[in-house]
C-alpha cells in the first residue's frame, strides 16, 4: 500500500532566513535514513503485507491454535509432523538434497509474521554474500554526473531555494551546487539589506540524462510556481556543459583565484613603487625649499648690513652661481703657419715606385 504523496510541489523555502547554507549530501542522506526508519516503525501492523506461505497437509490440533496462544512445544510438534510428508515427496522425486536445504527455512502455518520476516532477511543476506563472493573484484562505477551552468540567477535566490525549485519539477537528485556571489559596486555605498545576490552558478546532477533534459526543458522559460511568488516572472538561463565535470570547475575556480591574486600583487607592488617615488620627490622639494629660504634670509641680512658684492643696478649678486664648462683645446698640425710634412722612408718610396 503506497503512502499519499504531497501535492504542494511549488512550495519554496523562505529567503528571509539568516542561515545561508549550501547543499550537504551527507546531511541529506542521514535525514532520509531517519525519515525512512520513522515511517517503517510508525506504520501499523495491518498495513504490512504478509509473506507467501506454502500449503501443507497438517492435521488440526484442537482449538487452542486459533487464538495463537499455544506453547513452543506444540509449535515444534507441528513442525516435525509437517516435515514428514515433505520428506516422502522428496524421496519420490529424487531431490532430497535441495529440499533438505530449504526445509529449515520454510515457515509453517503456525509461524508468526516476525518469524517469516527473519527468514526472508536471512535468505536475502545469503544471496548478497554469494553474489559478492562470486565477484570479488567489482569494477569501479564511472562518473556519469552532468553539470549545468546558470548564466544568471533571480535576485536574492539562495542555493537551498534553487535546489528545491529544480527537485520540485522532477529534476533530481542534485549532488552539488556552487554559486558565485555578485560583487557590489563602490558607487552603491553601504546598504542596510544583508541578503546576498549571486551572479552565476553551477549545479551537478547525479545523471547526465537528467541534466540534459533539465537544460532543454527549463531554458528560456519562467520560473513559475505560485502566482504571487517572489521568483514567478524570472527567466531561467541555463546550459548543459558537455564533457564538463565538477573537478574541472574546481580547477578553473582555483586558477582564476590565483590569477586575480597575482594581478593584485603586481598592482600593489606598482602602487608601492609609485608611492616611494612620490615621497622621495616630496622630501627633495622640502630640502630645496629650505635652501631657498636660507638664501633669502642671508640676502636680507646682507642688505641690512650693506655688505656683499653689488652688481649692475645695485642688486646683491646672491643669485645662483654661473657655471662655466671648460673646453679642451684642439691640437692643430699647423704651427705658426708652417705645415709639417711627414717624411717617408726610402724603402717605402722604392716599393711605391715599382708599383706606380
Swiss-Prot record:
Residues 46-56 have a biased composition (Basic residues). This is Pre-rRNA-processing protein ESF2. The gene is ESF2. Belongs to the ESF2/ABP1 family. Keywords: Nucleus, Ribosome biogenesis, RNA-binding, rRNA processing. The keyword Nucleotide-binding does not apply. Involved in the small subunit (SSU) processome assembly and function, and in the 18S rRNA synthesis. Required for the early cleavages at sites A0, A1 and A2. InterPro entries: ABT1/Esf2, ABT1/ESF2_RRM, Nucleotide-bd_a/b_plait_sf, RBD_domain_sf. Residues 13-23, 72-103 have a biased composition (Acidic residues). Residues 146-235 form the RRM domain. It comes from Coccidioides immitis (strain RS). GO terms for cellular component: nucleolus. GO terms for biological process: endonucleolytic cleavage in 5'-ETS of tricistronic rRNA transcript (SSU-rRNA, 5.8S rRNA, LSU-rRNA); endonucleolytic cleavage in ITS1 to separate SSU-rRNA from 5.8S rRNA and LSU-rRNA from tricistronic rRNA transcript (SSU-rRNA, 5.8S rRNA, LSU-rRNA); endonucleolytic cleavage to generate mature 5'-end of SSU-rRNA from (SSU-rRNA, 5.8S rRNA, LSU-rRNA); small-subunit processome assembly. One of its GO terms (molecular function) is RNA binding. Residues 34-43 have a biased composition (Polar residues). Residues 108-134 have a biased composition (Low complexity). Residues 1-141, 298-318 are annotated as: Disordered. It is found in: Nucleus, Nucleolus.
Amino acid at each position: 500500500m503506497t503512502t499519499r504523496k504531497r501535492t504542494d510541489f511549488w512550495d519554496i523555502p523562505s529567503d528571509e532566513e539568516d542561515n545561508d547554507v549550501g547543499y550537504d549530501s551527507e546531511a541529506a542522506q542521514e535525514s532520509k535514513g531517519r525519515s525512512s526508519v520513522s515511517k517503517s516503525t510508525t506504520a501499523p501492523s495491518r498495513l504490512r503485507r504478509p509473506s507467501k506461505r506454502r500449503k501443507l497437509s497438517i492435521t488440526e490440533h484442537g482449538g487452542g491454535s486459533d487464538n495463537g496462544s499455544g506453547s513452543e512445544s506444540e509449535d515444534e510438534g507441528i513442525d516435525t509432523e509437517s516435515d514428514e510428508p515433505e520428506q516422502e515427496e522428496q524421496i519420490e522425486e529424487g531431490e532430497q538434497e535441495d529440499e533438505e536445504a530449504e526445509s529449515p527455512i520454510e515457515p509453517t502455518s503456525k509461524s508468526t509474521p516476525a518469524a517469516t520476516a527473519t527468514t526472508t532477511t536471512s535468505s536475502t543476506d545469503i544471496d548478497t554474500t554469494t553474489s559478492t563472493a562470486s565477484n570479488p573484484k567489482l569494477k569501479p562505477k564511472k562518473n556519469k554526473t552532468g553539470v549545468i551552468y546558470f548564466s544568471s540567477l533571480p535576485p536574492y535566490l539562495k542555493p537551498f531555494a534553487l535546489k528545491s525549485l529544480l527537485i520540485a519539477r522532477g529534476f533530481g537528485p542534485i549532488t552539488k551546487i556552487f554559486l558565485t556571489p555578485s560583487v557590489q559596486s563602490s558607487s552603491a555605498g553601504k546598504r542596510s539589506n544583508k541578503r546576498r545576490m549571486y551572479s552565476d552558478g553551477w549545479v551537478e546532477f547525479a545523471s547526465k540524462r537528467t541534466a540534459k533534459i533539465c537544460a532543454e526543458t527549463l531554458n528560456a522559460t519562467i520560473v513559475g510556481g505560485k502566482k504571487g511568488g517572489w521568483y514567478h516572472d524570472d527567466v531561467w538561463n541555463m546550459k548543459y556543459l558537455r564533457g564538463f565535470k565538477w573537478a574541472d570547475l574546481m580547477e578553473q575556480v582555483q586558477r582564476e583565484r590565483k590569477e586575480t591574486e597575482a594581478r593584485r600583487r603586481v598592482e600593489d607592488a606598482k602602487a608601492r613603487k609609485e608611492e616611494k617615488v612620490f615621497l622621495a620627490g616630496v622630501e627633495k622639494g622640502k630640502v630645496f625649499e629650505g635652501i631657498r629660504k636660507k638664501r633669502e634670509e642671508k640676502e636680507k641680512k646682507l642688505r641690512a648690513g650693506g655688505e656683499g658684492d653689488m652688481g649692475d643696478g645695485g642688486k646683491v649678486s646672491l643669485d645662483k652661481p654661473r657655471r662655466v664648462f671648460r673646453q679642451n683645446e684642439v691640437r692643430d698640425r699647423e704651427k705658426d703657419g708652417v705645415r709639417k710634412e711627414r717624411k717617408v722612408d726610402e724603402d717605402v718610396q722604392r716599393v711605391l715606385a715599382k708599383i706606380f
